[in-house]
Amino acid sequence: MADLLDYGHAIGDEVLKEIAMRLERAIRKEDTIARLGGDEFAVVMESLKEAEGTMHCVQRLNAAFKEPVIVGDAQFVLSASIGISLYPQNGTDAHTLLRNADTAMFKAKEAGRGTFQFYVEEMTRYAVERARMEADLREAVERGELE
């Protein structure tokens, strides 16, 4: 196994291309995949009628990471943290759905490698409270109120 950061951009790009191809094979013909930047991908899956269908899709996406990615002599073992937002429960426009999926993804990352989270409204409240607390702490440090 290797740390991807030790190999530079060219190898990182090859790993991302391989992951993109695996994800493309994991989704249905009517689904859409896009790289958002860095190592983040978005998958738009239309016409999922029930949670069971969503779970089946998540399992297929996670399976894309089961086998190591081999580039040259290096082998990379990767995992995915998946955030899920559902239309119309979690938003009615692309911006809101993507933001909420991103929030859920960060919760999945906190839970550990290879996990997923459905978006729930409490996640946004938690994120807002945390950002407010961090801002308050920064201000306290700047004013010399903490030792």
Please provide the spans of the model-predicted regions.
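Conserved long alpha-helical elements within nucleotide-processing catalytic cores of c-di-GMP signaling
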Residues: 1-28, 34-43, 49-59, 99-102, ...
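Short catalytic/binding micro-motifs of nucleotide second-messenger systems
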Residues: 25-30, 62-75
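ATP/adenylate-binding site constellation spanning eukaryotic-like Ser/Thr protein kinases
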Residues: 38, 81, 113
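Catalytic strand-loop-helix junctions within cyclic-nucleotide turnover domains
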Residues: 44-54, 72-75, 80-97, 122-126
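Catalytic-core segments of nucleotide cyclases and related cyclic-nucleotide turnover enzymes
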Residues: 59, 72, 87-113
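Conserved beta3-strand ATP-binding lysine motif
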Residues: 119
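Active-site core of bacterial EAL-family cyclic-dinucleotide phosphodiesterase domains
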Residues: 129-147
